[in-house]
Amino acid sequence: MEKCREYVCKDNKNVQKKSNYEWDKVDKNTTNNCSKESHNQWGYNPITGEEKKSDEEIKSAKQQDKKDFSERDSLSVINLSGGKDSTALLILMIEKELPIDIVINADPWMEFPEMYEHLERVDEYLYRERGIHITTLRHPKGFEWLMFEEPKKRSSAIQKRIEMGVSLYGNGWPGFKVRWCTGQLKIKLIDAEIQRMKTEKRVLHHIGIAADEVQRCKEKQYPLVEWGITEAKALQICYDHGFDFGGLYKKYHRASCWCCPFQRISELRNLRKYHPQLWKQLMEMDQRAKEQFGSGALGQFKQRWSIEGLENRFAQEEKPRLILP
């Protein structure tokens, strides 16, 4: 039986192909090990309700894509985070029959289990519609290694750590001044892959930023802005096509990493309520950070709040209040 996933794991030196995505929270023995025939066991698309393409139609579409690709002077690349905006971008580009050569996703290792399941469904949808799979980039060591174990190499950084009296290893909690998580786990990997692609062809890099987030736009392609698709519209497009993100957007403002220090207090309250195991893991990470980096910025999860402090606050909120007559 042929593996129906093939992803690219990239570090700074080489590109390594893997036949399975290393998702701890997803059953690898189900959707990842499917045959070509399993994509066409129904006569319709269960996500859109539309009639499915036959094997012959998919083969013909692939051949046409190859022909179109060879005739075009650029690669059409979609940056898929998996959130509502980038998912809506992918859906609309498919529906508008715009060229899509490569869809890349940078996995920060700390997504919600529901997000990994969502990406599985999006990958199946992409394969059915365009005959390609998501290409996933991963840092070879991951978030926790970067947070606690990455050795400091620059003499200035080492000297500063010595003066602070903290560990010479790890970056601590990400902060507004040093948001190393996004840089190391997403931007750096994606930029390196885009630069590699540019050695072959010109690249049109499409990013899913909504029309009401126009301040984030710089020099790349932002179709949602051009089409006037707001965040609310993007989410509705996803819902209309059967992508509900496992209910994440009903509990959280953004479906970002579950350990993100930039979450709202209300989101952290919901993390404790709806994902108690992740909350427990976050408490352990925060305790380790305090022991390794102290009470300074590196060891502080959120300004004015530690996870232990939030645990006490949330527990206090749950206690029944005495109502006086």
Summary of predicted features, one role per range:
Residues 10-41, 52-59:
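Intrinsically disordered, low-complexity, charge-rich segments with an acidic bias
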Residues 59-325:
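Nucleotide-activated chemistry modules centered on ATP-dependent adenylation/adenylyltransferase
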